[in-house]
């Protein structure tokens, strides 16, 4: 069974992610379980002992450098299990940039409810998606590209 942890950073989109993840896993035919846990509900030690195969860190308000907004997510990113796959969405991705040495800064142009086409390699979460697919953006912060580790 694939065990998935969805960390809720107090964002209304978390349960959209839960639903989409459930649909994808159902289609895969693999047995799975998705646990939704708020970022301040359990300790890192409790979550780590549950041995999740996958972790998804949700969107949320605030900056990932502030523990009141990012909670246990920092420790999860600092100490992933060797075979654990982690996906960050919005605040979750910004948190990944922050934890691994990048800078999270205010965007010159906030993108709230705007769409943009994306280019991708067709692998992983992009498998089966067409080039130039329009995606919705909701963010005021960005990971500063030149600060990201190579």
Task: Give the positions of each predicted feature.
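Cys-based phosphatase fold recognition centered on the PTP superfamily
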Residues: 1-7
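Conserved G/P- and acidic residue-centered "switch" motifs that form tight phosphate/ATP-binding loops
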Residues: 8, 90
